[in-house]
């Protein structure tokens, strides 16, 4: 038995697991086989616990499949394996273009100073962190929609410049991307108080560069941005069509990556879908780990409301939290804004927070939401998205090109409206409520297994909620 056994396991796990999961949890593992024991080394305790909790059965199952009664015992360790043997992950890439296929520009070491030895060195720049201390991992409400993003961000905070560099988070407005950026910054500085961590919106980078050009201070600009320990840039899509800014950021990106300095970027869309940004930049955005943040599901929306109320020392009855969460679905910011309005109204009037009170306090917001998201609107949007006719969604046709969009539309109707399953079934050609339930479960399963279905669902949610 040899280390090729782990190669076989990796190949199977890569086929069986979603690409993001494999890249995040399995790819960082190192293996050592000796005395009928397969030791798997994880980069930190967090990864070790996650793999042991989530994938232990998968790995043991594969060992039994390949070795039968001779399957080695599995042991987990934190750290790196002895360097006497090297084991490489299969070459085929799962999340982003392999770095070996695109040569990274090499940073040229500064030449010897020679006759310039007596010239004073440039002053150390003063770093403006801009990290909001209020946004931490502790007050970030985790749910199925953001679990992977939070886990990746946590690892980056614990090990900046390590496995996930750059980390690219994308998703709609108000879903928690900015919160995670600040949480990473706070996490890094908690471990290393003197760390040079800089958070900014992409437009600030552009403004700083323009100012540097105007003041003939571009070298100071470069020195500032290329000497940080972690650069956290929000809404990178605003670099679109700003060629000079993209050029400068391209070189900054390369310098930071070569120096093992952490880069985290956020956007409202997948890197390859950002228009107006050079392909060489979009390619680099995907070099590390790319993770989506989706709109929060009902349970997470309720948890967000309850936590926000608790932070404000407000008692929010559970049934009221469910009432709000079932009607406001698009993003966290909308939820928190609605709750702030409810709290303000309660403080002004001295009334208890009940469902009737919330219905009155949020009547315009709730009316607008119900007007925007209807089953008819969902059917129209889904039909346009998949380039089929609404009549196809209502028909008895069962071909996949029609059945899958129909299931998607039913799942969206359950998620975004307050209609019952029988009502949804009636709206789709008089179908039974069990058909709707099957469609919802099927789409939920496919969102776990298929990146394309997951993207379709997120895109449609974003379109319908905007």
Swiss-Prot record:
Function: Plays an essential role in the initiation and regulation of chromosomal replication. ATP-DnaA binds to the origin of replication (oriC) to initiate formation of the DNA replication initiation complex once per cell cycle. Binds the DnaA box (a 9 base pair repeat at the origin) and separates the double-stranded (ds)DNA. Forms a right-handed helical filament on oriC DNA; dsDNA binds to the exterior of the filament while single-stranded (ss)DNA is stabiized in the filament's interior.
Subcellular locations according to the entry: Cytoplasm
UniProt keyword annotation of Zinc present: no
Record-level GO cellular component terms: cytoplasm; plasma membrane
Annotated ATP binding sites: 174, 176-178
Keywords of the record: ATP-binding, Cytoplasm, DNA replication, DNA-binding, Lipid-binding, Nucleotide-binding
Subunit structure: Oligomerizes as a right-handed, spiral filament on DNA at oriC.
Family: Belongs to the DnaA family.
Main location: cytoplasm
GO function terms (MF aspect): ATP binding; ATP hydrolysis activity; DNA replication origin binding; lipid binding
This protein's domain notes: Domain I is involved in oligomerization and binding regulators, domain II is flexibile and of varying length in different bacteria, domain III forms the AAA+ region, while domain IV binds dsDNA.
Lineage: superkingdom: Bacteria
Residue ranges, annotated region (Domain III, AAA+ region): 130-346
Region Domain I, interacts with DnaA modulators, annotated ranges: 1-86
GO terms under biological process: DNA replication; DNA replication initiation; regulation of DNA replication
Region of interest called Domain II, as start-end residue ranges on this chain: 86-129
Protein name: Chromosomal replication initiator protein DnaA
Provenance organism: Salmonella typhimurium (strain LT2 / SGSC1412 / ATCC 700720)
PROSITE patterns xref list: DNAA (PS01008)
């Amino acid at each position: 038995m040899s280390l090729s056994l782990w190669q076989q396991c990796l190949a199977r796990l890569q086929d069986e697991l979603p690409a993001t999961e494999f890249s995040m949890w399995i790819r960082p593992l190192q293996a050592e086989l000796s005395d009928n024991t397969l030791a798997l080394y994880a980069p930190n305790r967090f990864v070790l616990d996650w793999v042991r909790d989530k994938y232990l059965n998968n790995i043991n199952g594969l060992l039994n499949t390949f070795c039968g009664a001779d399957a080695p015992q599995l042991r987990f360790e934190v750290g790196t394996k002895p360097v006497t043997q090297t084991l490489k992950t299969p070459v085929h890439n799962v999340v982003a273009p392999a770095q070996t296929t695109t040569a990274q520009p090499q940073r040229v070491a500064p030449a010897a100073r020679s006759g310039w030895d007596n010239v004073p060195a440039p002053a150390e720049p003063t770093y403006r962190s801009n990290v909001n201390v209020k946004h931490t991992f502790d007050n970030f409400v985790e749910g199925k929609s953001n679990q992977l993003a939070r886990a990746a961000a946590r690892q980056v905070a614990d090990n900046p410049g390590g496995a996930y560099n750059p980390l690219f988070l994308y998703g709609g407005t108000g879903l928690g991307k900015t919160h995670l950026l600040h949480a990473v910054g706070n996490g890094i500085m908690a471990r290393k108080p003197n760390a040079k961590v800089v958070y900014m919106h992409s437009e600030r980078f552009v403004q700083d560069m323009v100012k540097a050009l105007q003041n003939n201070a571009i070298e100071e600009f470069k020195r500032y941005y290329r000497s940080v320990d972690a650069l956290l840039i929000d809404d990178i899509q605003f670099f679109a069509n700003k060629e000079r800014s993209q050029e400068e950021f391209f070189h900054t990106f390369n310098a930071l990556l070569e120096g093992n300095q952490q880069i985290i970027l956020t956007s409202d869309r997948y890197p390859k879908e950002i228009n107006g940004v050079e392909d060489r930049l979009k390619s680099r955005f995907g070099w590390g780990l790319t993770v989506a943040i989706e709109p929060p599901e009902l349970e997470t929306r309720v948890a967000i409301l309850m936590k926000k109320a608790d932070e404000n020392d407000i008692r929010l009855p559970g049934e009221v939290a469910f009432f709000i969460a079932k009607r406001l679905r698009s993003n966290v910011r909308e939820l928190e804004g609605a709750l702030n309005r409810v709290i303000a109204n309660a403080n002004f009037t001295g009334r208890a927070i009940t469902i009737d009170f919330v219905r009155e306090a949020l009547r315009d917001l709730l009316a607008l939401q119900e007007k925007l998201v209807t089953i008819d609107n969902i059917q129209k949007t889904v039909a346009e998205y998949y380039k089929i006719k609404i009549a196809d969604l209502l028909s008895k046709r069962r071909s996949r090109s029609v059945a899958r969009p129909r299931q998607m539309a039913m799942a969206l109707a359950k998620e975004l409206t307050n209609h019952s399953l029988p009502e949804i079934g009636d709206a789709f050609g008089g179908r039974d409520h069990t058909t709707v339930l099957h469609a919802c479960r099927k789409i939920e399963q496919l969102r776990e297994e298929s990146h394309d279905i997951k993207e379709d669902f997120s895109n449609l949610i974003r379109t319908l909620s905007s």
